[in-house]
Regions:
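Conserved short "hinge" loops at termini or chain/domain junctions
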Residues: 1-65, 102-116
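Short loop/turn elements at secondary-structure junctions
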Residues: 59-116
Length: 116
């Protein structure tokens, strides 16, 4: 996985890195996903990106969140930016987003801790 958020999402959405015509639309969808993460309690303030300079570690340094947040953002953006034509695949993606949302909620819950 790339460290740049936008580059990671472009790879996942099969948009060549040199193609910049979709960057604005992708950034808007990425920011929407990050706002949902803010509402879930993943950050103390809303996080946004404007270009390919923002990295995943700019959003969080929590290893639990770094394990699931990129996948969550990829799924949400892909579903909005380029939804699959097959309804089964769409439903599968929605189910995965729901599962990732639950995992993220547990990870940020102050009453839930990983035992070492």
């Amino acid at each position: 996985m790339r460290s740049s958020i936008l580059e990671t999402i472009k790879d996942y959405c099969l948009v060549p890195q040199e193609t910049t015509v979709f960057d604005g639309q992708l950034c808007a969808q990425i920011n929407s996903a990050f706002f949902t993460l803010f509402e879930l309690g993943c950050s103390k303030s809303p996080f946004t990106i404007e270009d390919d300079t923002s990295e995943w570690t700019d959003f969080t340094d929590n290893p639990l969140l770094l394990a699931v947040v990129p996948d969550y953002v990829q799924q949400v953006v892909r579903l909005k930016f380029d939804p699959p034509a097959n309804s089964f695949v769409v439903n599968q993606m929605k189910d995965e987003i729901t599962e990732l949302t639950s995992r993220i909620s547990y990870a940020v819950d102050p009453g839930w801790e990983v035992e070492e």
